[in-house]
Amino acid sequence: MKHRNFTFDKTSYLQLSELGSKFNLSFSSHLVLGNKIIGLDGANKRLLVSEINDGYSKSYIIELDKVSAISVKKTYNSIKPGELNKRKFEEFLKTIHLQFEFADEAETILLPFYENETDNIRDLPRLERNAKNWQLILSKIIGAQISEVAKERRQLLLTD
């Protein structure tokens, strides 16, 4: 099993490198998440997401310049009365996503970090920590640009 994961990681990193070259990206951070690998090009404010399913790969780039907010979104299964006496709260957790909201509000992208159907609950603390860390890093990147937009708007208001 470890050998298989190592092969996937090696293949993923090779694919990330090739895609980075193809799209002229230079990654400052990256992370393997199950069948996905994400790479951050902080200088160009782009996040590459590459996913491998059944031997086919699908990749897309999130332009962080167009993102207005990034949050960690958790969804839970329904909890019936008395179930919390038998099971821990985190056992009801269904997914943890990094949610990207765009300035034009036309689109929202959900990047899964934890899915209870495919991920082991023992990995939950690590995956949740990863989601929060990436949310913090990416929010700082878009925060600088949002601050610039706010300054420009204030300048426009002052000149009117």
Predicted regions and their residues:
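Anionic N-terminal interaction surfaces
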Residues: 1-55
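Generic detection of short hydrophobic beta-strand segments and adjacent strand-loop junctions
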Residues: 31-33, 60-62, 109-111
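Short, surface-exposed coil-to-beta transition loops
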Residues: 33, 57, 93-96
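Residue-level detector of beta-strand structural context in well-folded domains
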Residues: 36-38, 60, 98
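A generic structural motif
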Residues: 41, 68-71
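Short connector loops at helix/strand junctions that flank enzyme active sites
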Residues: 42-44, 62-65, 93-95
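Short coil-to-beta-strand transition motifs
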Residues: 56-68
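Acidic, Ser/Thr- and proline-rich intrinsically disordered linker/docking segments
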Residues: 70-160
